[in-house]
Amino acid sequence: MKVVVAIDSFKGSMTSMQAGRACKEGILAAMPKADVVVRPLADGGEGTVTALVEGMNGTYEHVDVTGPMGQKVHATYGVLEDDTAVMEMAEASGITLVEGKPDPWKATSLGVGEMILDAVHKGCRNFIIGIGGSATTEGGIGMLSALGYEFYDDDDNILPPVFGSLVRVKKIKADKVPSELKQCHFKIACDVTNPLCTEQGCVYIFGKQKGVQEHEKAQMDKMMRQYADCVEEYAGKSFSETPGAGAAGGLGFAFLFGLENEELKSGIDIVLNAIQLDKELKNADIVVTGEGRLDGQSAMGKVPVGVAKAGKKNGCKVIALAGSVTDDAVACNKEGIDAFFPIIRGVTTLNEAMDIKNAQKNMKNTAEQVFRLIDISSLME
């Protein structure tokens, strides 16, 4: 029997690979002859770098970059064996890096571009970048500036890479953009489909969490529209209505405009392709997935259900193991998960349940008992 294990991280507890390896240990305790393959899993957001680096023999790179409020921050990204860089923009320009009240007029994505350039200079030509958790609403002008684009006002002054500059952009130059960027391919993990502007755009929909006041929204959206018009006139092409252009405060728009070989895709689709899950599932019998909490929202989510759909496409039975399970998680059974189980085995505190050693033990023990049952069932056929 071949079993493929692909479990999302249990946030605040086990990483994807820690959960997967504990599960494998339990399966082999029940069925020593089973062929068990563990693959990393993430949705393109928090935990993606750790999952892919741990699960695909990657390494970590560290670089000091400009943080969202202009401060120096120490950013980490991953490099896989095929020289693919895996990044989370939140490492450089995330909302968690802002101390105190967010200021959308001063926040910049400069550090994202600096992190990309660091990887380019180290030989990376393929990129997987998650753009969730941003602190910025400046249309990606910071990232583009770091990559060599120059934005000028009416008096030929180079503008600082912050929101307040957007309405003043009159001319754009790309003379200093490194030629190596044309050799790079970017897969942007983006599950947001909002355009750049209008009441469905980044200012109106996501601005509040980044410090935009209600009375500022109309003005800031108008400024974003003027910036987009200038960029699109320079490029001779429209990007602002493309689904995902409004992601990460307009960083999606900046990728579409500033980089030649880019694609904005669902994060789980990018990760499943990177880990080559379909290849492993072709001759598998069972796939085990899971996450920290399985509930009704999981049925509309992306990670366990994404794995389940891939499993069903390849004729596999699908089992999910979760830290906790709610009554409405039964909806997951209609989305390809044949059976699901909580791993917590008794009354406990949240801190005890999330302790990594306890969580790994619970995962191992639950997986063992589930597969003992599967072993018994096979004898009864």
Where are these regions (language model features)?
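N-terminal loops that bind phosphate or other acidic moieties
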Residues: 1-131, 135-381
